[in-house]
Amino acid sequence: MTDRPDADLPADLPADLPTRDIARALVFDPANRLLLIEYEAVRPIDPARPEARGFWFMPGGGLEPGESHEAACRRELSEEIGVTEVELGPCVAVCDGPFHLFRKPRWARERYFVVRLASDAVDTSRLAETEDNPVRGTRWWPLAELAASAERIEPAGLAELAQRIASGDVPDQPVRLDWQNA
């Protein structure tokens, strides 16, 4: 464990969260839409709207022992969206901090890679069996809709980063993103 500012967490969470290294992908189709997965949060997202529990996230997941971020990203894409032959682009962003919308709150250390698919055909039939939280569905988001959406998209700044990448401006160093709840 590292020295972290866990004091800002909701009162019902443990003060010392376990750390989880995670790899995720910004998955683009040929039309430059971004694939996201909708999950159901285990606790209210917005105290003013306790019924609002849906949030959108990129495909990806935790590293297995000895696994690199790149290898984990490829494995997760196979498990979650059925994509096995994929060219992984560069790591374009990082997001480190406490995340408490999943069943198992954690200090997440996430790395995000770019993936461009030749079509929008994905197989999500195994997605629900690999996830801690209920999966509500998947969606290919047009980037303008993603940027204008009032829905909870994690992490903050994802829509802007996706638009930047789609326009051809791929960061040469990973940018830092933050959780909506940070």
Locate each region found by the language model:
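Active-site-adjacent beta-strand/loop module that shapes the phosphate/pyrophosphate-binding cleft
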Residues: 96-126, 139, 164
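Residues that scaffold the ATP/ADP-binding catalytic core of kinase and kinase-like folds
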Residues: 37, 66, 146-149
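A generic structural micro-feature
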Residues: 17-19, 50-55, 103-109, 130-135
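N-terminal strand-loop-strand
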Residues: 2-58, 70
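Nudix hydrolase/Nudix homology domain
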Residues: 53-56, 119-123, 127-182
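A structural signal for short, well-ordered beta-strand segments
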Residues: 25, 91, 111-113
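Short, charged/polar surface micro-motifs in flexible loops or helix N-caps
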Residues: 28-34, 42-43, 64, 94-98, ...
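The catalytic Nudix box helix
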Residues: 58-92
